[in-house]
């Protein structure tokens, strides 16, 4: 927790009854009281304890000692919850600067692309839409492109970077090549740490 600075609540993720496979995580920094988690949603009675445990673990990893964390869950998978929490903490500036909440990486999400592999079909997936990510491999594309450029609003690029990193590490991409399209340079440089070293096999640079 940063001292000598006004603490501001922040959130990441969509709200509303129509939200599916996503969540809104709100972080309200406090000066004492440790981390208190509240889970709301239709499946809170089933998964509330697991979500609470994940949020508590995430706050510890991110350096958040005292905060109220409110999760409005719409059926989000663990990688989505991790991404929304980290993005909210970064926005609130209440944890350890540049800390990451990294879930274990799937064993298959390692290694470079095979030389000479076909790239006939590529599926673009918006970097801020986890509801499209989990089943992307079912379409059996040669490559999946997690897009951080055109499909992401400027105000949501910070959260999308974290989401893409968490998805690269956690999801089963089948035989698809894992690609990330970054923003135009020099701004796209900020995208690279969230893709390189986390399972991306190819970085796509927009036309300049």
Cite the ranges covered by each PLM segment.
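Conserved alpha/beta-domain cores
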Residues: 115-117, 122-140, 145-208
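N-terminal intrinsically disordered, cationic/polar leader segments
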Residues: 1-113
């Amino acid at each position: 927790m940063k001292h000598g600075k006004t603490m501001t609540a922040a959130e990441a993720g969509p709200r509303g009854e129509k939200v599916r496979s996503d969540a809104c995580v709100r972080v309200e920094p406090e000066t004492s009281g440790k981390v208190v988690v509240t889970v709301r949603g239709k499946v809170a009675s089933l998964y509330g304890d697991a979500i609470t445990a994940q949020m508590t673990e995430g706050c510890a990893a991110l350096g958040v000692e005292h905060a109220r964390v409110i999760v409005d869950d719409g059926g989000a998978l663990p990688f989505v919850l991790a991404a929304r929490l980290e993005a909210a903490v970064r926005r609130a500036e209440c944890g350890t600067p540049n800390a990451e909440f990294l879930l274990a990486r799937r064993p298959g999400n390692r290694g470079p692309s095979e030389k000479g592999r076909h790239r006939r079909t590529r599926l673009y997936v918006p970097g801020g839409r986890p509801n499209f990510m989990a089943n992307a491999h079912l379409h059996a594309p040669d490559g999946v492109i997690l897009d951080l450029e055109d499909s992401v609003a400027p105000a949501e690029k910070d959260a999308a970077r974290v989401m893409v990193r968490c998805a690269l590490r956690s999801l089963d991409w089948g035989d698809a090549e894992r690609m990330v399209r970054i923003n135009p340079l020099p701004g796209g440089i900020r995208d690279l740490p969230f893709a390189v070293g986390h399972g991306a096999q190819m970085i796509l640079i927009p036309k300049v």
